[in-house]
Amino acid sequence: MGDSTGEPGSSMHGVTGREQSFAFSVQSPIVHTDKTAKFDLPVDTEHKATVFKLFSFAKPHMRTFHLSWISFSTCFVSTFAAAPLVPIIRENLNLTKQDIGNAGVASVSGSIFSRLVMGAVCDLLGPRYGCAFLVMLSAPTVFSMSFVSDAAGFITVRFMIGFCLATFVSCQYWMSTMFNSQIIGLVNGTAAGWGNMGGGITQLLMPIVYEIIRRCGSTAFTAWRIAFFVPGWLHIIMGILVLNLGQDLPDGNRATLEKAGEVAKDKFGKILWYAVTNYRTWIFVLLYGYSMGVELSTDNVIAEYFFDRFHLKLHTAGLIAACFGMANFFARPAGGYASDFAAKYFGMRGRLWTLWIIQTAGGLFCVWLGRANTLVTAVVAMVLFSMGAQAACGATFAIVPFVSRRALGIISGLTGAGGNFGSGLTQLLFFSTSHFTTEQGLTWMGVMIVACTLPVTLVHFPQWGSMFLPPSTDPVKGTEAHYYGSEWNEQEKQKNMHQGSLRFAENAKSEGGRRVRSAATPPENTPNNV
């Protein structure tokens, strides 16, 4: 095969995925832009990778993937580190059921605000700074758990640690800027799923660390405190790695590209406006509130549920509870892959149907879990429920990147915050008072999942249609270029600030499924007045 030369991104020719990668420095966080740079993976016109090699560390795409999911997983470990140790902590601090429930609400409420902020940080400063600084700044709060002495301190510290869950937004934003739209479901699902797996890892890790420390001579009430130094140090290590090895965009870091004039410097007010005025944003906020939201709520109660209901030992209850979080290893990527597969044949309409089916099934399995009377039945129902909820998360963020190109960060932040808000609301309604037993709470949570999934039928893209309605027949408004180009005014278009949106629109034409035209309009010929 002949050598390929030329500027990558000028066309799909000349990008074979076999050229030597030399443009990006591993040692320095400052990555210099080089228009002649070649990538280790084949890329599209936006320099996004068109293939996903899971066991590769190719820079910048796969290196970013691994840094992103590991840092997010670290935050999950610390946020839910207290959950498997609650049977010990509640005796030490004299916690009531309401205290434990309030702490669960607090642990996921903090990131409602921080995820909104992280969305803006990603849009304006880049995901590398957002992820690295949040992970490192939250480390002191993790260490602080070792020094709490009462219920108020326990609730407050769990609230503060929960801020770090905003790394989910940087994770999903980062993947959406590094990988092509045809594989974004799988990539987003894998990154977030493996990150969420931290909720399962901590169910195994913290009881083991606690037991090791206790056997080394510490008392039970001292051992659980020392155990929190493990996730605290993980925060510091991952923050340093992300800051030094991460990269905002395929071509370099955002600040460097803005100075070179290759990336438009946007304004917060405008990206916020386009995010909040797009009705699809709020539907996905609700949907994610009852997929990711219920997963977070379950992480807080599932170990205690098995410990109390079936009178299991602490480590046994933790092992079973870990299965819920560990299902993220394959369930969330499977949801994203299912969405990509459906889109290959049915476009965006296939993605929407996939989301509705998976999330509704998860809700029904949740109802079954709440009504299970034997340990075996409860475990089976829990595993199926976890697979449905987590696959629905993957299917959701296989669609979110298409809602807006310009306001991707803000919309990702709002959707992610919806997950935390849904978790806090669910925890408050069903698991923080004596009105419901844990079994009843799980049952009603399942009913809420089924009901809150119905609004997905209202999501309609003029260029692709909805679950029940076809796309627009308008030759202008029914195009991808018009949908994404309409986020820029005429003055901004004259400055060519919308070119990134047009390139994205060209690559997103595959979401039309079998309706895609055989002869697509080249991106350079797309009118500037869309």
From Swiss-Prot:
Question: Phosphothreonine is carried by which residues?
Answer: T521
Tissue-specificity statement:
Root cortical and epidermal cells. Not expressed in new lateral root Primordia. Detected in shoots.
Molecular function in Gene Ontology: nitrate transmembrane transporter activity
Q: Which UniProt keywords apply?
A: Cell membrane, Membrane, Nitrate assimilation, Phosphoprotein, Transmembrane, Transmembrane helix
Membrane topology per the entry is: Multi-pass membrane protein
Q: Which SUPFAM superfamilies match?
A: MFS general substrate transporter
Q: Where is this region: Disordered?
A: 490-530
Q: Record keywords: Phosphoprotein included?
A: yes
Kindly summarize what the UniProt induction comment says about this protein's expression: Up-regulated at transcript level by light and sucrose, and transiently by nitrate, but no changes at protein level. Down-regulated by ammonium, amino acids and N-metabolites resulting from nitrate reduction. Induced by sudden N starvation and by growth on low nitrate concentration. Circadian-regulation. Expression increases during the light phase and decreases during the dark phase.
Location (main, coarse):
membrane
Into which family does the record put it?
Belongs to the major facilitator superfamily. Nitrate/nitrite porter (TC 2.A.1.8) family.
Name under which the protein is recorded: High-affinity nitrate transporter 2.1
Organism, by scientific name, is Arabidopsis thaliana (Mouse-ear cress)
Q: Which gene encodes it?
A: NRT2.1
